[in-house]
Amino acid sequence: MSETGNAIKTDDMQDAKDLSDIVDLGLYPIDTRDNAAYCALVAGGRDRLRREGAAIFPGFVKDAAVRSMATEAVALQSKMFRFHEEHTVYFKPQEAEREASHPLRRMMVTEKDTAAYADIPQGSLVRGLYQSDAVLHFINDVLDDGQLYRHADPLAALNIQNFAHGQQLGWHFDRSDFSVTLSIQAPEAGGDFEYVRMLRKEGDECYDSVGRFLDDPTTQDILVLPQVPGTLTMFRGRYSLHRVAPVIGDRLRINAVLAYVNEPGVVFNDYARRLFYGRATA
């Protein structure tokens, strides 16, 4: 990352209205969509998504800004909801009649601490990033999936996730076509994002291949994305099995999840809000 110096003070966050305070516009000129550098940036991201299922943009957020985001995330820890769930990799109910080795009998464990959008302070840098039209347009251009909108849910639109020692995201396939995350702080060890490309297909859950992988991960090539602060990642996880490996050590693994959808006005129902945030209202 190219930005150096001290972190932006918390008091200054309220005044950080310029995108250049947050994003390294020298590396990522997302504020000028009509130039050759921007077009090359988008084309490269699309190509990586097509070939690898993930497009990473290291140093997207400046060092000073990402350090301030980390400080803010740690301060939010006491307000976070601890989410703990045992689930199949498909997020389908466990089927007890299946043989013990079947993927629909195998339970993964996910545990994380989450700050809902409503709990992230107004004027914070991570809110500024999410609310930026230039960032939205850039993500929209790279994903190339039709018009995108910011999620309208007061809890789910933007989340900060803290992973303490032993916490993880178990192996799973996403229910959405894509995800957008920002790495804010790396743990002392562990916490890597690991994935296996296209382990299932549209209309075919590929139970045999998935089961073999769960028995012996060496049957597939596991790709690894280390947690590097300031990196923006776009990932297609509907057909690629993935996880966050267990975190090791006292330093939190911190990332932000920026939620975008293909139609305006999308919100969670009360059940989903209670499940993921422990409450139904902001």
Language model segments and positions:
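Fe(II)/2-oxoglutarate
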Residues: M1-R51, A280-A282
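Short functional linear motifs
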Residues: R46, V66-R67, L136, F178
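Glycine-/proline-rich flexible loop or hinge segments
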Residues: R48-I56, Y117-G123
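Short amphipathic
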Residues: A55-V61, P226
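Signature of the catalytic double-stranded beta-helix
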Residues: V61, S68, E72-L76, M80, ...
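Short, solvent-exposed beta-strand-terminating loops
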Residues: A70-T71, A75-A96, V196
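Catalytic core of non-heme Fe(II) oxygenases with the double-stranded beta-helix
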Residues: A118-R127, L136-L232
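Catalytic core of Fe(II)/2-oxoglutarate
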Residues: D192-A282
